[in-house]
Amino acid sequence: MSSTRFQALSELHERKAIRNEIPGNRVSEYFGNNVFYYHKMREYLTDDAYDKLMECINTGARIDRQTADHVAAAMKEWSIQKGVTHYTHWFQPLTGTTAEKHDSFFKPLTDGRALEKFDGSMLVQQEPDASSFPSGGLRNTFEARGYTLWDPTSPAFIVGNTLCIPTIFISYTGHALDYKMPLLKALHAVDHAATAVCQYFDKDVNKVAVTLGWEQEYFLIDSSLHNARPDIAERVMAFMQEFEYESHLLGIPVTTRHNEVAPNQFELAPMFEEANLANDHNQLVMDVLEKTARKHNFRILLHEKPFEGVNGSGKHNNWALSTNTGVNLLKPGKNPKTNLQFLTFFVNTVAAIHENADVLRASIATVGNDHRLGANEAPPAIMSAFLGGHLSRMLDDLEKNIKAGKMTPEDKTDLKLNIGKLPQA
């Protein structure tokens, strides 16, 4: 055993950083090149098809078959120009990672020729084998079929020579077999409830989106040892640079990188995005991390608690509610009216955490998380809301001073005093 370890250490010392050639010095020159974003849709779609797709994305309207055919043709043309040969419905089963079933654009004809085919029916639905994935008891053993259904709110992207189409994953009976469908339902419910409240303050608000900014922690270990290593700082930087380049090609706005507490533990973070897209990007990031690490003779450890006695890795996220008019509903305002709106959402968020802590905890329950939570590191195993001293005192004052259940003009005037300050950490 010791000779194997020494041999691995010797091999590790001989390894050099692998440099990846990144074209140009401006990220803006290649950011999102492998993503079928809205500006690219405009290039490949008719005005009518583009408008109908935007209506589907923005309002949830059903998309007709003709429009789906137009979108499929546009995706095929764009992706084939970039060297793509296959497409896949990219989904998020109950495994904590993603899954794919690849199909070729290539279709043989009866006269011996062939063509590339991709139409609306192939875009909208696929049928992977649901028996290959956990179901939580929602799928009968004799109902092996599962269905993936296109999620138009998250843009398609290219990995290698494959066009990846974000989808939900459901059973033969229509039950969710993934993490995306419950998320989309929750986002719709929050939008509906928050928009109704916002209408009391601003009639121009017709949509509230949940925004999400996540962090991904990970351990990076040399593949020849996997559990021990000498210093590899130069190689880590080369790995990070290539990983960020590959992420930017996929439209993932990674902006932050730094060391974490444990030896050879690191963290990355992107700019916040709409929550469904941010969730997709986090799933995609883990795959990019794995593939890039192997090119640099590393192994990525994404497990929440890979080492005993050493702090683990986690996904910390910062979420908010944003209206279509650009207002962050969880940010204190600058006048009594906007502060009253902030307080409305603020106190209801705290109440929701208090009343639904068990459901919130259950939604993040995994074996890995159970190993980590409460083990002398953040976060603890309880669900709590830390408000900071300033906001706590403000709520105490409101509770003490407003006795009749209604706010006097003086109470409303007081709302403009100091609430706009940042809560203390």
Task: State what each model feature region is.
Residues M1-G24, T141-F157, T162:
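N-terminal hydrophobic targeting/anchoring segments and the immediately downstream early-domain regions
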Residues S2-Q7, N25-F31, Y50, E260-E267:
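Short N-terminal helix-initiation segments at or just after the protein's N-terminus
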Residues L12-G120, V124-N140:
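Histidine/acidic residue-rich metal-binding segments in metalloenzymes
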Residues D64-A68, H89-W90, F118, A269-M271, ...:
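A cross-family glycoside hydrolase active-site/sugar-binding cleft signature
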Residues V71, L94-T95, A262, E308, ...:
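Positions that flank functional sites
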Residues V84, E100, P108, G136-R139, ...:
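Short, surface-exposed, charged/polar-biased interaction segments
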Residues A144-L302, N311-A425:
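Glycine-rich, acidic/polar active-site loops that bind/position phosphate-bearing ligands
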